[in-house]
Protein backbone atom coordinates (compact mmCIF):
# COMPACT_ATOMS: atom_id res chain seq x y z
CA UNK A 1 0.00 0.00 0.00
CA UNK A 2 1.38 3.40 -0.98
CA UNK A 3 1.87 5.91 1.83
CA UNK A 4 1.02 9.63 1.79
CA UNK A 5 2.26 11.33 4.98
CA UNK A 6 0.84 14.81 5.49
CA UNK A 7 3.39 16.14 7.99
CA UNK A 8 6.91 15.76 9.35
CA UNK A 9 9.44 18.10 10.98
CA UNK A 10 12.53 16.59 9.34
CA UNK A 11 13.74 19.68 7.47
CA UNK A 12 13.79 21.85 10.59
CA UNK A 13 15.70 19.16 12.47
CA UNK A 14 18.26 18.89 9.66
CA UNK A 15 18.77 22.67 9.62
CA UNK A 16 19.19 22.78 13.41
CA UNK A 17 21.77 20.01 13.14
CA UNK A 18 23.65 21.78 10.33
CA UNK A 19 23.74 25.07 12.26
CA UNK A 20 25.53 23.19 15.04
CA UNK A 21 28.05 21.78 12.58
CA UNK A 22 26.31 18.42 12.14
CA UNK A 23 26.11 16.37 8.96
CA UNK A 24 22.69 14.71 9.12
CA UNK A 25 21.22 14.00 5.70
CA UNK A 26 17.79 13.43 4.22
CA UNK A 27 19.17 10.18 2.79
CA UNK A 28 19.69 8.55 6.18
CA UNK A 29 19.36 9.96 9.70
CA UNK A 30 18.14 8.96 13.20
CA UNK A 31 14.90 10.95 12.79
CA UNK A 32 11.48 9.56 11.87
CA UNK A 33 11.85 10.30 8.16
CA UNK A 34 14.64 9.78 5.64
CA UNK A 35 14.73 8.51 2.07
CA UNK A 36 15.77 4.99 3.03
CA UNK A 37 12.88 4.67 5.50
CA UNK A 38 10.47 6.13 2.94
CA UNK A 39 11.56 3.68 0.26
CA UNK A 40 11.22 0.76 2.66
CA UNK A 41 7.73 1.98 3.61
CA UNK A 42 6.62 2.28 -0.04
CA UNK A 43 6.01 6.03 0.16
CA UNK A 44 4.20 7.88 -2.59
CA UNK A 45 4.33 11.39 -1.08
CA UNK A 46 5.87 13.04 1.97
CA UNK A 47 4.88 16.55 3.02
CA UNK A 48 7.87 18.30 4.58
CA UNK A 49 6.64 20.96 7.01
CA UNK A 50 8.75 24.02 7.79
CA UNK A 51 8.13 24.96 11.41
CA UNK A 52 9.14 28.23 13.09
CA UNK A 53 8.84 28.66 16.87
CA UNK A 54 7.75 32.30 17.18
CA UNK A 55 9.02 32.64 20.75
CA UNK A 56 12.50 31.34 19.95
CA UNK A 57 13.30 32.90 16.57
CA UNK A 58 13.98 36.63 16.13
CA UNK A 59 13.16 36.76 12.41
CA UNK A 60 10.61 34.04 11.53
CA UNK A 61 10.63 34.78 7.80
CA UNK A 62 14.43 34.71 7.53
CA UNK A 63 14.62 31.45 9.46
CA UNK A 64 11.90 29.92 7.29
CA UNK A 65 13.91 30.88 4.20
CA UNK A 66 16.89 28.96 5.60
CA UNK A 67 14.62 25.93 5.87
CA UNK A 68 13.45 26.41 2.28
CA UNK A 69 17.11 26.30 1.24
CA UNK A 70 17.68 23.15 3.31
CA UNK A 71 14.62 21.51 1.74
CA UNK A 72 15.85 22.08 -1.80
CA UNK A 73 19.52 21.41 -1.08
CA UNK A 74 18.80 18.07 0.60
CA UNK A 75 16.18 16.75 -1.82
CA UNK A 76 17.80 17.93 -5.04
CA UNK A 77 20.86 15.84 -4.12
CA UNK A 78 18.86 12.65 -4.81
CA UNK A 79 16.91 13.26 -8.03
CA UNK A 80 16.86 9.57 -8.88
CA UNK A 81 14.93 8.78 -5.69
CA UNK A 82 12.59 11.71 -5.06
CA UNK A 83 11.14 14.69 -6.89
CA UNK A 84 9.64 17.90 -5.53
CA UNK A 85 6.00 18.42 -6.51
CA UNK A 86 4.06 21.63 -6.99
CA UNK A 87 1.21 20.25 -9.12
CA UNK A 88 -0.74 17.03 -9.60
CA UNK A 89 1.09 16.58 -12.90
CA UNK A 90 4.42 16.61 -11.03
CA UNK A 91 3.17 13.78 -8.83
CA UNK A 92 2.02 11.74 -11.81
CA UNK A 93 5.39 12.28 -13.52
CA UNK A 94 7.29 11.06 -10.46
CA UNK A 95 5.03 8.00 -10.22
CA UNK A 96 5.64 7.18 -13.88
CA UNK A 97 9.40 7.51 -13.37
CA UNK A 98 9.42 5.39 -10.22
CA UNK A 99 10.35 8.21 -7.86
CA UNK A 100 8.87 9.25 -4.54
CA UNK A 101 7.47 12.76 -4.17
CA UNK A 102 8.05 15.60 -1.70
CA UNK A 103 5.84 18.63 -1.10
CA UNK A 104 6.91 21.78 0.73
CA UNK A 105 4.48 22.88 3.45
CA UNK A 106 4.48 25.54 6.17
CA UNK A 107 3.61 25.08 9.84
CA UNK A 108 2.96 28.47 11.49
CA UNK A 109 1.38 31.23 9.43
CA UNK A 110 3.20 33.76 11.60
CA UNK A 111 6.31 33.25 9.49
CA UNK A 112 4.58 35.42 6.86
CA UNK A 113 4.60 38.35 9.32
CA UNK A 114 1.02 39.21 8.37
CA UNK A 115 2.09 40.06 4.80
CA UNK A 116 0.26 38.39 1.92
CA UNK A 117 3.23 39.33 -0.28
CA UNK A 118 5.38 36.94 1.78
CA UNK A 119 2.67 34.28 1.51
CA UNK A 120 2.88 34.62 -2.27
CA UNK A 121 6.67 34.42 -2.09
CA UNK A 122 6.42 31.10 -0.26
CA UNK A 123 3.97 29.89 -2.91
CA UNK A 124 6.39 30.89 -5.66
CA UNK A 125 9.08 28.88 -3.85
CA UNK A 126 6.88 25.80 -3.95
CA UNK A 127 4.89 25.82 -0.69
CA UNK A 128 1.49 24.29 -1.31
CA UNK A 129 -0.02 23.98 2.17
CA UNK A 130 0.11 26.05 5.39
CA UNK A 131 -1.25 25.95 8.93
CA UNK A 132 -2.59 29.33 10.00
CA UNK A 133 -1.24 28.99 13.54
CA UNK A 134 0.85 26.80 15.79
CA UNK A 135 0.41 26.96 19.57
CA UNK A 136 0.59 30.75 19.82
CA UNK A 137 -1.63 33.63 18.76
CA UNK A 138 -0.33 35.34 15.64
CA UNK A 139 -1.47 37.91 13.08
CA UNK A 140 -3.93 35.43 11.56
CA UNK A 141 -5.69 33.76 14.45
CA UNK A 142 -5.53 31.75 17.64
CA UNK A 143 -4.80 28.21 18.81
CA UNK A 144 -7.03 26.45 21.30
CA UNK A 145 -6.48 27.33 24.96
CA UNK A 146 -3.64 25.62 26.80
CA UNK A 147 -3.80 24.66 30.47
CA UNK A 148 -0.88 23.10 32.34
CA UNK A 149 -2.04 21.05 35.31
CA UNK A 150 0.12 20.34 38.34
CA UNK A 151 2.22 17.22 37.89
CA UNK A 152 1.84 17.22 34.10
CA UNK A 153 4.68 18.05 31.73
CA UNK A 154 2.54 18.78 28.67
CA UNK A 155 -0.40 21.22 28.50
CA UNK A 156 -3.96 20.22 27.80
CA UNK A 157 -5.74 21.95 24.93
CA UNK A 158 -9.28 23.18 25.54
CA UNK A 159 -11.65 24.39 22.80
CA UNK A 160 -11.70 28.13 22.18
CA UNK A 161 -15.00 29.02 20.54
CA UNK A 162 -14.73 32.79 21.01
CA UNK A 163 -11.73 34.08 19.05
CA UNK A 164 -12.09 33.56 15.32
CA UNK A 165 -9.74 34.49 12.51
CA UNK A 166 -8.50 38.06 12.49
CA UNK A 167 -9.26 40.30 9.52
CA UNK A 168 -5.75 39.50 8.30
CA UNK A 169 -6.47 35.79 8.78
CA UNK A 170 -9.57 36.05 6.62
CA UNK A 171 -7.52 37.87 3.98
CA UNK A 172 -4.92 35.09 4.12
CA UNK A 173 -7.33 32.17 3.70
CA UNK A 174 -8.98 33.87 0.75
CA UNK A 175 -5.60 34.54 -0.85
CA UNK A 176 -4.50 30.95 -0.20
CA UNK A 177 -7.67 29.75 -1.90
CA UNK A 178 -7.00 32.03 -4.88
CA UNK A 179 -3.42 30.78 -5.18
CA UNK A 180 -4.31 27.13 -4.82
CA UNK A 181 -2.48 26.70 -1.51
CA UNK A 182 -4.14 24.16 0.80
CA UNK A 183 -5.40 25.55 4.12
CA UNK A 184 -4.30 23.34 7.02
CA UNK A 185 -6.42 23.76 10.16
CA UNK A 186 -4.19 21.73 12.47
CA UNK A 187 -3.37 23.80 15.60
CA UNK A 188 -6.16 26.29 14.80
CA UNK A 189 -8.83 26.88 17.44
CA UNK A 190 -12.47 25.90 17.04
CA UNK A 191 -13.70 29.42 16.27
CA UNK A 192 -11.02 29.81 13.61
CA UNK A 193 -12.03 26.55 11.95
CA UNK A 194 -15.63 27.75 11.70
CA UNK A 195 -14.35 30.96 10.09
CA UNK A 196 -12.40 28.95 7.52
CA UNK A 197 -15.66 27.20 6.68
CA UNK A 198 -17.44 30.56 6.50
CA UNK A 199 -14.97 32.48 4.36
CA UNK A 200 -13.72 29.82 1.92
CA UNK A 201 -15.31 27.45 -0.57
CA UNK A 202 -12.67 24.83 -1.35
CA UNK A 203 -11.71 21.77 0.73
CA UNK A 204 -9.14 22.15 3.50
CA UNK A 205 -7.19 19.62 5.57
CA UNK A 206 -6.11 18.85 9.12
CA UNK A 207 -2.68 17.40 8.45
CA UNK A 208 -1.79 16.21 11.94
CA UNK A 209 -4.78 16.41 14.28
CA UNK A 210 -6.70 13.82 16.27
CA UNK A 211 -10.47 13.41 16.29
CA UNK A 212 -12.16 14.17 19.61
CA UNK A 213 -14.82 11.55 19.01
CA UNK A 214 -15.34 8.62 16.67
Q: What residues fall within each predicted segment?
A:
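Histidine/acidic residue-rich metal-binding segments in metalloenzymes
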Residues: 114-124, 149-205
Amino acid sequence: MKVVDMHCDTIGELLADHLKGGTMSILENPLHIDLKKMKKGDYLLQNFGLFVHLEKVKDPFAYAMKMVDTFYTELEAYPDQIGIVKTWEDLEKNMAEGRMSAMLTLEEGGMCLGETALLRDFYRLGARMMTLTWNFQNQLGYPNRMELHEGESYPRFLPDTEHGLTEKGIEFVQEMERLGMIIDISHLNDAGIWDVLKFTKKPFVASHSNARHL
